[in-house]
């Protein structure tokens, strides 16, 4: 039988539509893949920033096998595609590049994001989530909502994810970005990751060591070679949190600063989760459709990392010149482990063992003159959050151009003030900050 999709007279849009018809079972040479559904949505509906045009179509997938089969089918026809989970780390444009895409949307099945909260012995390895209370091993389909997984693990008496409570998005994005907050990151509890290798056409489990994990980075972040389909974590079974090292969170829980610095203090994971949710809500970092401060891609810039004492001292000197001695002495500045030259942000090119130093992007943004709620003069459609300077927000009618204009203004201002180039954290589709 001839594959009608290979018709050379198809335009890009026509080819995408024809492939979607085949996947939906309504076109010629229809393809039936269990656990899939073809639908139409705009990126404004699929992302937390709520901007972006509509792609050619959306294929919802409710299992790793469905994702693998759909991606394989689209790749076989050289169809441009984008994998989307919670849409919390995307900035999407409105041009032709976007309208020609087919989105493969990870969508967990069942209620509460597919999280089964029964005893470990009753859990099915074929479900969206498997939690083993005895060993602390947790496995989740990539499409499960992240915070619902965190809530389920805390409720099950496991510790390790509580500091990452309230982060929007899906499980599959967490190892790609090496998601982190309040002194914890996914790399600390990651056991293994299931990938669909698009080159070999195979599903496989890989160890964290294969991902080159760094600060808000993995080697999956800027490549389309593989798709995360499931993630497995190793959590603790004593019901206690990870050590409380982040000052703001430690203070919220009544932990002395010196004790927190020692990195030995742990608290019940349930208490830590509640404290984190309260802190995030106060910064507009918990999704609320009625609050434009939450219409964002989360923390927009990564905390900059510089290599070597000379680079560190240059930033401190610039702060001292602009803001005075008191600010220079009290600015947030942390020594971090050398990345050995990976692309994890700021530390690229560092030799092994060379000291690296991390600054607070939010602190630098504010000291460069960008207050909470700041917007480009004459354009109020996009602004910094009124609660947190690190979030760039859609005030209700912003386009990608508005967000880019705001991001460029902030990045330029920080560079001119302190000589630091802020790196954006989101993935850009059909639009660029450069």
Swiss-Prot record:
Active site positions, chain numbering: 216, 299 (proton donor), 425
GO MF: FAD binding; UDP-N-acetylmuramate dehydrogenase activity
Major localisation: cytoplasm
Cofactor list: FAD
Subcellular localization: Cytoplasm
GO BP field: cell division; cell wall organization; peptidoglycan biosynthetic process; regulation of cell shape
Catalysed transformations (reactions): UDP-N-acetyl-alpha-D-muramate + NADP(+) = UDP-N-acetyl-3-O-(1-carboxyvinyl)-alpha-D-glucosamine + NADPH + H(+)
Record pathway: Cell wall biogenesis; peptidoglycan biosynthesis
Domain FAD-binding PCMH-type: 51-238
GO cellular component: cytosol
The protein, known as: UDP-N-acetylenolpyruvoylglucosamine reductase
A Pfam entry, by short name: FAD_binding_4
Function text: Cell wall formation.
Species of provenance: Corynebacterium jeikeium (strain K411)
EC number: 1.3.1.98
Keyword set, alphabetical order: Cell cycle, Cell division, Cell shape, Cell wall biogenesis/degradation, Cytoplasm, FAD, Flavoprotein, NADP, Oxidoreductase, Peptidoglycan synthesis
Similarity section: Belongs to the MurB family.
Broadest EC class assigned to this enzyme: oxidoreductase
PANTHER family: UDP-N-ACETYLENOLPYRUVOYLGLUCOSAMINE REDUCTASE
